């Protein structure tokens, strides 16, 4: 019996007997009238019109209708009543003709149903444990059974679930009392049977739970790792040769070597460390010496340099030479073409227009900032000045001088607004300038020089208009690497058409002095062999028996600690060190010869073309009558206003002849 409230089938006592009687009754098409009343009664709950139109059908017709209604498939209809009954009720034809046609159709359907029931009984009787099958038509004979209502499509609820023949056979083999009472228990039993037959793939949640269970089992229970094969048994160590136990490391093997070998190895390691330290110190030794020297130079004011200095004439002359270089070569070609032949920029009241292009200048070896005022008086205004120097104390003093210029102190002769300046300690020849922040912002080309790209050599370049190096490049010729690093920094900072201005010792003067002294020394040695007497050296020359060369006067002195070439040609061009002394300025600082031809050949590798080169005294003779530079020399105390003579002693002139100035263009 189907209970809609519990959604289950319940069997009562005597159901099997009634099922058997139903099967026997199905063999007889005209069993009785009571089943017909139940069918019409069940349908009458949903359709009252049927009961009114058929108050009492005959037994033959109702029995056939019962069999047809139970076994025929559901018809597709949108009504809630069985299609066959509703059609029979609502037909408007003659009742006598309709009754005859219904009787014929129901009789044929009853005969087909009787054949099917007979076949079913034969198949069931052949099983090992026969069990009578309950006929669906017999459900109408039960007084407490209510016909299952049809769904919207006309199908009945008892026809929804179909059980295969194998499951029916297995269920029939089980005893009736052990069968689950509810549908839920039967479904669980069925699922258990299906799980025994074949395992379905687990869901994601089951795999997750299985992983957690497995991890817990790994922690708490025995592991299921495969057993690895056992290692082969080791042969026992002979007792007469026990293994000697030692600490790990090289120290454990020291006992195997004699003490003399260990001492010799230790000495070799110490000697190698000393040599490496010497090589490292040689690379930075000169820069350290120069840095310490210039940091120790005391700061003297302008008044002392003009009154008490012993070399005040030489100081003024050197400053005038640097001003001449800045005035002649710092402006670009456009600026010079605009004022060509007019020298309007020389007038104090001639302020350049506001839209005029301003210069970007970097000074390699700026020292204490002694050239700041010279750049402030440049014909083309300066927008940015970057000062680099290896001496930290000099950088501090240069920054203080610049701050004094900004505040109004020392603005003598200034006709342009003060430029922006930045200072930073830096080894300009031994290190790459690309790591300086302000240089990176302005621009520096790392691809200049040999090995650079062709496009960089033609179109590349830095962002500075002028690179200045006053009295400094001779420190770079300690080695070829330093010299090339210096030129790489210069060429990398310069833009196309930029100028490289500088002042350095004149190698022609050094070569002439060295060859002259060596010739006199050789002549004296030849005369000494004849007379066996030594002649006193001439004035200004000092000769030593060990072959060293030295010359100078009371103001300056040059001394070579090594043997110099007899002809005065320095080969190779790098590493020819000498000591230079300048009164009140330089105290025996090591410097290096800058062979000019070798230097010019190196500059060609970095796209630097020589534009100007002259000794100091030649520059004076050429520019002393210039309308701008001539009066400037008088204001700087280089020339006497009354006589026009150069205000320097002969010793100062000799010291000034040791230098020359140059200018290269970036092409």
UniProtKB/Swiss-Prot annotation:
Site label mRNA cap binding, positions: 368, 374, 401, 474, 591, 659
Start and end residues of each stretch annotated as Disordered: 1-272, 521-547
Claim: Transferase is one of the keywords in the record: yes
Sequence ranges assigned to domain mRNA cap 0 methyltransferase in this UniProt record: 309-667
Positions contributing to S-adenosyl-L-methionine binding: 322, 365, 389, 427, 470-472, 475
Residues holding mRNA: 318-319
Task of the protein: Responsible for methylating the 5'-cap structure of mRNAs.
Official protein name in the record: mRNA cap guanine-N(7) methyltransferase
């Amino acid at each position: 019996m189907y209970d809609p409230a519990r959604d289950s089938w319940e069997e009562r006592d005597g159901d099997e007997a009634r099922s058997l009687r139903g099967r026997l009754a199905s063999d007889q098409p005209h069993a009785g009238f009571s089943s017909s009343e139940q069918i019409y009664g069940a349908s009458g709950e949903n359709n009252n019109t049927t009961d009114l139109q058929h108050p009492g059908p005959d037994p033959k017709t109702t029995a056939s209708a019962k069999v047809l209604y139970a076994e025929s498939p559901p018809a597709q209809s949108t009504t809630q009543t069985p299609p066959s009954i509703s059609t029979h009720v609502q037909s408007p034809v003659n009742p006598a003709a309709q009754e005859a046609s219904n009787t014929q159709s129901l009789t044929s359907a009853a005969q087909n149903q009787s054949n099917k029931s007979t076949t079913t009984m034969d198949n069931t009787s052949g099983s090992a444990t026969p069990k009578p099958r309950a006929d669906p038509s017999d459900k109408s004979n039960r007084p407490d059974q209510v016909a299952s209502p049809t769904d919207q499509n006309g199908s009945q609820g008892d026809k929804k679930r179909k059980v295969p023949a194998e499951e029916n056979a297995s269920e029939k083999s089980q005893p009736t009392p052990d069968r689950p009472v509810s549908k839920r228990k039967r479904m669980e039993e069925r699922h258990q049977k299906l799980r025994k037959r074949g395992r379905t793939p687990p869901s994601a949640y089951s795999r997750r739970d299985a992983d957690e269970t497995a991890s817990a089992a790994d922690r708490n229970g025995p592991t299921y790792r495969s057993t690895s094969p056992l290692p082969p048994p080791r042969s026992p160590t002979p007792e007469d040769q026990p293994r000697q136990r030692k600490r790990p490391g090289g120290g454990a093997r020291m006992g195997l070597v004699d003490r003399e070998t260990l001492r010799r190895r230790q000495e070799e390691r110490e000697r190698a460390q000393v040599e490496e330290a010497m090589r490292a110190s040689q690379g930075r030794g000169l820069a350290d010496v120069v840095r310490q020297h210039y940091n120790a130079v005391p700061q003297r004011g302008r008044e002392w340099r003009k009154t008490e200095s012993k070399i005040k004439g030489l100081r003024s002359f050197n400053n005038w030479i640097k001003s001449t270089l800045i005035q002649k070569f710092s402006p670009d070609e456009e600026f010079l073409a605009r004022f060509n032949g007019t020298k309007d920029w020389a007038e104090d009241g001639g302020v350049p227009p506001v839209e005029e292009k301003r210069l970007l200048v970097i000074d390699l070896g700026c020292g204490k900032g002694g050239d700041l005022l010279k750049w402030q008086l440049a014909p083309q205004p300066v927008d940015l000045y970057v000062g680099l120097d290896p001496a930290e104390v000099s950088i501090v003093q240069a920054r203080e001088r610049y701050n004094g210029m900004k505040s109004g102190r020392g603005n003598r002769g200034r006709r342009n607004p003060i430029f922006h300046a930045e200072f930073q300690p830096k080894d300009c020849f031994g290190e790459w300038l690309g790591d300086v922040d302000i240089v990176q912002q302005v621009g520096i080309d790392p691809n200049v020089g040999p090995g650079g790209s062709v496009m960089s050599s033609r179109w590349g370049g830095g962002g500075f208009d002028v690179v200045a190096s006053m009295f400094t490049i001779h420190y770079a010729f300690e080695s070829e690497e330093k010299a090339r690093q210096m030129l790489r920094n210069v060429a990398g900072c310069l833009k196309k058409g930029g100028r490289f201005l500088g002042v350095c010792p004149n190698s022609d003067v050094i070569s002439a002095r060295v060859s002259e002294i060596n010739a006199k020394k050789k002549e004296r040695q030849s005369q000494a062999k004849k007379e066996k007497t030594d002649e006193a050296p001439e004035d200004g020359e000092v000769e030593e028996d060990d072959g060293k060369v030295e010359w100078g006067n009371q103001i300056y002195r040059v001394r070579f600690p090594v043997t110099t070439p007899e002809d005065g040609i320095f080969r190779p061009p790098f590493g020819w060190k000498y000591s230079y002394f300048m009164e009140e300025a330089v105290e025996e600082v090591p410097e290096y010869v800058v062979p000019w031809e070798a230097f010019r050949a190196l500059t060609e590798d970095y796209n630097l073309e020589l534009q100007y080169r002259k000794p100091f005294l030649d520059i004076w003779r050429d520019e002393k009558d210039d309308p701008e530079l001539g009066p400037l020399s008088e204001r700087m105390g280089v020339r006497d206003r009354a006589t026009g003579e150069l205000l320097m002693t002969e010793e100062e002139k000799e010291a000034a002849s040791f230098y020359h100035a140059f200018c290269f263009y970036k092409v």
